[in-house]
Amino acid sequence: MVIGSGLDVKLNVAFSVLEYALLDAPGAPVKQALLDAHIGKDVYGSYEDGILQPFFSIVAKNADENEKEKFLSIIRGTLKDIVKNGMDRKAIEAGINYFEFRFREADFSSFPKGLMYGIDVFDSWLYDENKPFAYLQQLAIYDELKKLAKKAISKT
């Protein structure tokens, strides 16, 4: 599913956090619901934001193709339940903290920092020559997401 624009850094960071909370964190609700229904041997998500039209996907490895409707139904049902009843506050906070830590640490393993920063610059510069540093200026976004999460979670 296409999600917004690659130039919307806040939306992209927020969807990375959601992908973590829904599919990667321990006890992630969408992943757990699919595994409990025996849809595939493993479930994972992916949010690809280095392109103009970022996309979000959910993959069930070794799933039966005939269970496609069940797969979609479980995802929709789980997401509707989350919208109705709220989401685990700690999972959202953990996702924000995880991505903020990775951003601050800038540990790219064996890859040179300059190369990785260059790739980050191209994520926005390719589509808007006036915003080459958009993906390098994320600290304020993490602060804003923390406030939004606290506000939204306090309502549930």
Where does each model-flagged region fall?
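Mature, solvent-exposed C-terminal subdomains and processed small-chain segments of exported/organellar
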Residues: 1-57, 62-156
